[in-house]
Curated annotation (Swiss-Prot):
The gene is 41. It comes from the Viruses. This is Gene 41 protein. It comes from Mycobacterium phage L5.
Amino acid sequence: MTDKAVYFDGQELPWYIAEDGIGFQPSNNGLHTLTVEFLVETATFKSQWEINHDGEWAWLKRTVDLEMRVQTRAFDRIMKEYS
């Protein structure tokens, strides 16, 4: 837990401090207790296979987009040359 995020298993969780969720109990022995209750939204984590799979598809999409731009520019150049 940091001042800006709550982390679980290396992943940042969406969170809010609960209403009346901060409590403080003083103690005679010098060990005081500060309690903070969080409301954490539903969080799911991708498996390594999903991460790799999504990365491969993202790479493929970028490659196709780049090739489309290259071919469109080549086509535009040819059209200007012969028109």
